[in-house]
Amino acid sequence: MQEILIPLKEKNYKVFLGELPEIKLKQKALIISDSIVAGLHLPYLLERLKALEVRVCVIESGEKYKNFHSLERILNNAFEMQLNRHSLMIALGGGVISDMVGFASSIYFRGIDFINIPTTLLAQVDASVGGKTGINTPYGKNLIGSFHQPKAVYMDLAFLKTLEKREFQAGVAEIIKMAVCFDKNLVERLETKDLKDCLEEVIFQSVNIKAQVVVQDEKEQNIRAGLNYGHTFGHAIEKETDYERFLHGEAIAIGMRMANDLALSLGMLTLKEYERIENLLKKFDLIFHYKILDLQKFYERLFLDKKSENKTIKFILPKGVGAFEVASHIPKETIIKVLEKWH
């Protein structure tokens, strides 16, 4: 069992990487999972969980269910179970479940503990660590949420064996995102190694990167913005396709390529660096065909990104490999010219 400590100002917690241990709780626990994960992994968790009382709430699977209705269902289950401030919630699932349970636990009784048990690669390397929580709205993705750190995170690689290839590759996109912005050595490892032979090490390295970033910038005031590489465009893609055509990681892969196009046009990436990132995405089958339906509407959606300020879009753009820059005040004409390639 490997451990990563995340020491923050208000609380410390650990990420455990290895076989899911027995979890002993003296309080009530509400498990929230989705309709697919519950069938695959809920019995495994229930075997290892000892609590004062356990209840299970199952939400429909998919990004489009990360909404007010699902949030209300979670909270209603908590009220019916009479959870108190000493009780906790357990998120068993991917990024959607992690985000929703984190948010629900942050607002129930003004905040109770929750444990993250991520079952997808994307959730293990990204969504389950760092405390960003939220739900989607008709206006955009993750526009309502909070910062609420988990009590603990348990990552069992056995969960990943049940993932379809497409879901696994979507998680790799988030690893590439972190590598390109923060760690040139991880980029080289992904380029030269067979991921199957070093998966645990890559997950550990990715979580370590995110942990270091979160410790430095918990509330996303500066360096943590790098974790949003590909997300300004990616969230607009998800919204335009009604969260149905692409998995989150797939949309982020497209978003990274759009960001690379913009960085290349601004002289922040050389053609060699641009092609290097492109080839890495190709290696993991993360090149997708996508055409923007309405160029003007897509451009306007970019302003709904949470990083935008004073009617200015902020883009996270790679500055070479292993570094990034927050770019703003980019002329509309420059952005539109880049987007025309995708129209």
From Swiss-Prot:
The reaction(s) catalysed by this protein are: 7-phospho-2-dehydro-3-deoxy-D-arabino-heptonate = 3-dehydroquinate + phosphate
Which CDD domains does this one have?
A: DHQS
Query: Required cofactors, per record?
Result: NAD(+); Co(2+); Zn(2+)
> What pathway is this protein said to act in by its record?
Metabolic intermediate biosynthesis; chorismate biosynthesis; chorismate from D-erythrose 4-phosphate and phosphoenolpyruvate: step 2/7
Q: Name one GO cellular component term.
A: cytoplasm
SUPFAM superfamilies, per the entry: Dehydroquinate synthase-like
Q: Name a GO molecular-function annotation.
A: 3-dehydroquinate synthase activity
Q: What residues does NAD(+) bind to?
A: 61-66, 95-96, 119-120, 132, 141-142, 159-162
Q: Where in the cell is it found?
A: Cytoplasm
| Entry's cofactor comment | Binds 1 divalent metal cation per subunit. Can use either Co(2+) or Zn(2+).
User: Which top EC class is named for this enzyme in its record?
Assistant: lyase
Asked whether the keyword Cytoplasm is assigned, the reply is yes
Keyword annotations for this protein?
Amino-acid biosynthesis, Aromatic amino acid biosynthesis, Cobalt, Cytoplasm, Lyase, Metal-binding, NAD, Nucleotide-binding, Zinc
The answer on whether this UniProt entry bears the keyword Secreted reads no
**Gene3D superfamilies on file:** 3.40.50.1970, Dehydroquinate synthase-like - alpha domain
Please give a single GO biological process term from the UniProt record: aromatic amino acid family biosynthetic process
What EC number(s) does this enzyme carry? 4.2.3.4
Give the family from UniProt: Belongs to the sugar phosphate cyclases superfamily. Dehydroquinate synthase family.
What is known about its subunit structure? Homodimer.
Q: What functional role does this protein have?
A: Catalyzes the conversion of 3-deoxy-D-arabino-heptulosonate 7-phosphate (DAHP) to dehydroquinate (DHQ).
Which protein, by its recorded name, is this? Answer: 3-dehydroquinate synthase
Species this protein is from: Helicobacter pylori (strain ATCC 700392 / 26695) (Campylobacter pylori)
The organism's lineage is:
Bacteria, Pseudomonadati, Campylobacterota, Epsilonproteobacteria, Campylobacterales
